[in-house]
Amino acid sequence: MLQPKRTKFRKMHKGRNRGLAQGTDVSFGEFGLKACGRCRLTARQIEAARRAMTRAIKRQGKVWIRVFPDKPITEKPLEVRMGKGKGNVEYWVALIQPGKVLFEMAGVPEETAREAFKLAAAKLPVGTTFVTKTVM
């Protein structure tokens, strides 16, 4: 699963997921899966969506993952009293804003790409839409 190789600090504040998305256009492939809302995508969810897509296109074409989980989420163990410091890092998330392109695909027909993205979207906790590359 995806996670940073090294970070400056082990743990991070919770923070807020506000603002506008960067990376709202299809850059690498022909088709894309764009987020319609805000969420935190875990590394497991990204991997599950990637597997669903690659199986649907039968390993033809190319898939780009445009998000990376770089925020550590900590949890305290079960039945532990409050206090005594921050919990251990349990998993990594990527903060998603509306309009962010999550995945891109090229080298497959549009119908195949739509079907693959539909399967991938079922694994994600946010509403998504299918987008195509616009040539200026």
UniProtKB/Swiss-Prot annotation:
InterPro entries per the UniProt record, alphabetical: Ribosomal_uL16 (IPR047873), Ribosomal_uL16_bact-type (IPR000114), Ribosomal_uL16_CS (IPR020798), Ribosomal_uL16_dom (IPR016180), Ribosomal_uL16_sf (IPR036920)
Record GO biological process: translation
Record-level Gene Ontology MF annotations: rRNA binding; structural constituent of ribosome; tRNA binding
Keywords: Ribonucleoprotein, Ribosomal protein, RNA-binding, rRNA-binding, tRNA-binding
CDD domains listed in its UniProt record: Ribosomal_L16_L10e
PANTHER family: 50S/60S RIBOSOMAL PROTEIN L16, LARGE RIBOSOMAL SUBUNIT PROTEIN UL16M
SUBUNIT field: Part of the 50S ribosomal subunit.
Name used for this protein in its record: Large ribosomal subunit protein uL16
Source organism per UniProt: Yersinia pestis
Gene behind this protein: rplP
